[in-house]
């Protein structure tokens, strides 16, 4: 029965990891860069890198 709880927790962890860009590695994997200010000119925000203040920006 403990194995079921472990597998369920692992499933939730995997599903929550794919719910958006939340780190610099996943930002780079999606073709973006981490910028601590507003995304400049031709770039648009596709997520965050280190929480709310740092944006993950990508060119159109």
Curated annotation (Swiss-Prot):
Keyword field: Antibiotic, Antimicrobial, Defensin, Disulfide bond, Secreted, Signal
Q: Major place of localization?
A: secreted
User: How is expression of this protein distributed across tissues?
Assistant: Neutrophilic granules.
Task: Give any GO molecular function from the UniProt entry.
Answer: CCR6 chemokine receptor binding
Report the record's Gene Ontology biological process terms. cell chemotaxis; defense response to bacterium
Segment forming the signal sequence: 1-22
Instruction: Kindly indicate whether the keyword Disulfide bond belongs to this entry.
Output: yes
An example GO CC term for this entry is: extracellular space
Q: Where in the cell is it found?
A: Secreted
Enumerate the SUPFAM superfamilies for this protein. Defensin-like
**InterPro entries (alphabetical):** Beta/alpha-defensin_C (IPR006080), Defensin_beta-like (IPR001855)
- Cystine links in this protein are 27-56, 34-49, 39-57
Q: In UniProt terms, what function does this protein have?
A: Has bactericidal activity. Active against E.coli ML35 and S.aureus 502A.
Q: Which family, according to UniProt?
A: Belongs to the beta-defensin family.
Name-wise, this protein is Beta-defensin 11
Q: What organism does the record attribute this protein to?
A: Bos taurus
Its gene name is DEFB11
């Amino acid at each position: 029965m403990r194995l079921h709880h472990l597998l369920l927790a692992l499933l939730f962890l995997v599903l929550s990891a794919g719910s958006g860009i939340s780190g610099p590695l996943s930002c780079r994997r999606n073709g973006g860069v981490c910028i601590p200010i507003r995304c400049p000119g031709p770039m648009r925000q596709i997520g965050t890198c280190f929480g709310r203040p740092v944006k993950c920006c990508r060119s159109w």
